[in-house]
């Protein structure tokens, strides 16, 4: 609204509601901050210069000599809305080593209210810092590394192209001229999107989901330095609306799943010649589906998250039946991340400013009325540290129970729920329980 426009009664009401909403959000945040020492073993809150729409842990971890810290790396990006050059960023995160011998009381005493951090065992440099910036044309909608070579990072752009950067061929600090020089350009889609997935079993194969209703499939091993632009091996055209997400199956190199604003879940087989019709599909939700995630330890189970505020659990053997609906979010479910070490736990991010951790083992468990007021039995933990929509989450492959979450108000958080809250729930899950 321009400053010189008269405020109508309706506008004034909207402004008043917005102020009330902000006050409520701030009050909730104060309560969360007060309870942080009792809910977490680690919390790091880092204010970015620009919001990041994406975050993903890199798989490496190194000890920092003569300290109680390990060093891990995160891939993030910028969303400057044209106000500055955009960048793909590699950030270093210093995390306390496990088993450092800190008592619970000492841990609570080490809570730094000003920094909003817990787990600062020793004096240290900045806990999160950029160690490499690479120029990017427009905001980084999503960034994901190739499993077989984590130095190769693909990004979703606002133009529809997918960029691939070999970060070892770029300086640690991006040139000030802002010129974007991806090592490979994947062409063929005409609109932006967010879904991006590397094949963990077939090196170089990557999928991209687009607002132009297509799914692109490329093999980057087909590129040459003389011509770094690649056309897709295939464009899949089965969806009738914006394709929000796509993911390769972790145990079948020929299978992938896609979800769309059309409410459809589609399972594709790359050995089929029909790129217009999926091998199987189902109406998954009665609203837009925003994300899909296959269970890394299962051949059959996967999750979908929707703008109907729910997460659905599916079994590929019985796709016509939704096996369970996880219900606790109060706004769109935007992203999902399975634990890399536990087959029964996953995290979900939502526009309701929350990240939830869920426990498949607890589905159907008995609850007291008091417990039921806090949510269903399978809701293990609620992270309330964000005051704006959570855009992306990533579960650390190197530090069990450590999660990174990025929100649209420039905040990046790295956190680990208290071991006392999670220990009773670290159990085994049997897929036969679903049958």
Curated annotation (Swiss-Prot):
Main localisation: cytoplasm
InterPro entries: G-protein_beta_WD-40_rep, Histone-bd_RBBP4-like_N, WD40/YVTN_repeat-like_dom_sf, WD40_repeat_dom_sf, WD40_rpt, WD_repeat_RBAP46/RBAP48/MSI1
UniProt WD repeat ranges: 135-175, 188-228, 238-278, 284-324, 328-368, 385-425
Pfam families assigned: CAF1C_H4-bd, WD40
Top-level taxonomic group: Eukaryota
Subunit-structure text: Component of the HAT-B complex composed of at least HAT1 and HAT2. The HAT-B complex binds to histone H4 tail.
Protein name, as recorded: Histone acetyltransferase type B subunit 2
Organism of provenance: Cryptococcus neoformans var. neoformans serotype D (strain JEC21 / ATCC MYA-565)
């Amino acid at each position: 609204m321009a400053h010189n426009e008269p405020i109508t009664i309706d506008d004034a009401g909207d402004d008043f509601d917005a102020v009330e909403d902000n006050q409520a959000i701030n009050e909730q945040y104060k309560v969360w901050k007060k309870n942080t020492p009792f809910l977490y073993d680690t919390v790091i809150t880092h204010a970015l210069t620009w919001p990041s729409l994406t975050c993903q842990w890199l798989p490496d971890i190194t000890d920092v000599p003569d300290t109680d810290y390990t060093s891990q790396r995160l891939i993030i990006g910028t969303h400057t809305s044209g106000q500055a050059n955009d960048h793909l960023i590699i950030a270093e995160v210093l995390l306390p080593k496990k088993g450092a011998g800190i008592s619970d009381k000492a841990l609570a005493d080490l809570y730094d209210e000003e920094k909003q951090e817990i787990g600062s065992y020793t004096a240290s440099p900045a806990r999160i810092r950029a160690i490499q910036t690479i120029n990017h044309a427009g905001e980084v909608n999503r960034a994901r590394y190739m499993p077989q070579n984590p130095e190769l990072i693909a990004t979703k752009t606002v133009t529809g192209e997918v960029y691939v950067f070999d970060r070892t061929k770029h300086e640690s600090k991006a040139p000030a001229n802002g010129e974007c020089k991806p090592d490979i350009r994947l062409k063929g889609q005409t609109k932006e999107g967010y879904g991006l997935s590397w094949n963990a079993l077939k090196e170089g194969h990557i999928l991209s989901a687009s607002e132009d209703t297509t799914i692109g499939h490329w093999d980057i091993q087909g590129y040459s330095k003389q011509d770094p632009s690649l056309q897709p091996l295939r464009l899949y055209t089965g969806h009738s609306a914006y394709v929000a997400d796509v993911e390769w199956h972790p145990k079948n190199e020929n299978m992938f799943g896609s979800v769309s604003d059309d409410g459809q879940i589609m399972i594709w087989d790359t050995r089929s010649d029909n790129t217009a019709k999926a091998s199987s599909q189902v109406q998954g939700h009665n609203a837009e589906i925003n994300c899909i995630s296959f269970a890394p330890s299962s051949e059959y189970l996967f999750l979908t998250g929707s703008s109907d505020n729910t997460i659905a659990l599916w079994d590929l053997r019985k796709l016509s039946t939704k096996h369970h609906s996880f219900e606790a979010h109060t706004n769109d479910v935007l992203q999902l991340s399975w634990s890399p070490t536990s087959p029964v736990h996953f995290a979900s991010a939502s526009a309701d400013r929350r990240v939830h951790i869920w426990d498949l083992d607890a589905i159907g468990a008995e609850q007291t009325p008091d417990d039921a007021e806090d949510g269903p039995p399978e809701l293990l933990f609620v992270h309330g540290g964000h005051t704006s929509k959570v855009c992306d989450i990533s579960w650390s492959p190197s530090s069990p129970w450590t999660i990174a979450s990025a929100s649209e108000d420039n905040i990046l958080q790295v956190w680990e729920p208290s071991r006392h809250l999670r220990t009773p729930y670290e159990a085994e899950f049997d897929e036969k329980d679903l049958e």
